[in-house]
Amino acid sequence: MTIAQGDVWWADLPEARGSAPGFRRPVVVVQGDALNRSRLATVVCVALTSNLKWATAPGNVSLPANVTGLGKESVANVSQLITLGKTDLTERAGKLARSKLELVLSGIDVALGR
């Protein structure tokens, strides 16, 4: 399986607890490709949601359906960084354009207070 930064994948997440994302949901890979190509068994992702009310939260990025390959508009919720096992990524849906990926990465900086 080839995983690249900017890929949109369906992932099998553990059961949700509190506000954490859970179950099967789309994610975008934000981990750099040097690590993605390494023997490291994990990958850092940002959870996507179809709940458009999150589009106005600081740093979050609205992603039109044609950008993600998911069939409906989504929001990259940058406050929900998730480290997953590479085997948790089950189905590749698409790949973000570099311009959208840069917005997500900038949003992570906002979430981290950078």
Segments from the language model and where they lie:
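Conserved functional hotspots at enzyme active or ligand-binding sites that engage polyanionic ligands
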Residues: 1-114
